[in-house]
Amino acid sequence: MQAMVARERRVVLARRVITRCSDAVGEDFDGVTAAEFQSLKEAGEFALSWEAHGLHYAIPMAVNTHLQAGRDVLANLSRTTLIHAKDRFARFEVINLTAERGVLAARLAARGRETAQQIAGRLDRATAHLPEGIEPLHLDNSGPLGQTVQAALDRLYPVKA
């Protein structure tokens, strides 16, 4: 996702709010406690929120500022919230990144955030179907990152003749 943002000026990355310790490796996010998350949610600070993997996740309302400025917002969402996102945002595209099971297992293990059992659960869920009504761009991310990024950008921003 960061590679797409680096290559395309029209794209910004949504910074998620997660009930995870802020010093966890991986994505850049705002870590909050469950109580803080609930307070923010009740105050209307989230455009979207959901639960997955034993955590609470949200996309802050700040995404509206980017959308109103004509930028596209790239966000890492759960399958469980895609229909809500489609209903919430006028223009909504889903990029469904997949990778070979061995490649995905190695990437998840390298993050160091989950146990082997949790990784196995993620691998099993990786093949789950998307909700009805979602028509994604399917991309295999098993190979070079640059190739995947270019394929996504070509689909999102086709060259007009």
What are these regions (language model features)?
Residues 73-78, 87-111, 126, 139:
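Conserved phosphate-donor/acceptor-positioning beta-strand/loop module used by diverse small-molecule
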Residues 9-11, 88-93, 132-135:
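Short glycine-/polar-rich loops that comprise or flank the Walker A/P-loop
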Residues 106, 110-114, 128-161:
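NTP-dependent small-molecule kinase module
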Residues 18-22, 80-81, 98-104, 144-145:
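Conserved nucleotide-binding/hydrolysis micro-motifs of P-loop NTPases
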Residues 1-9:
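A conserved segment at the C-terminal end of the G1
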Residues 13, 31, 49, 74, ...:
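Conserved beta-strand scaffold positions in the cores of enzyme catalytic domains, especially
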Residues 17-73, 77-79:
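ATP-dependent small-molecule kinase phosphotransfer cores
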Residues 65-68, 86-89, 130-132:
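Conserved catalytic network of the ASCE P-loop NTPase/AAA+ motor domain
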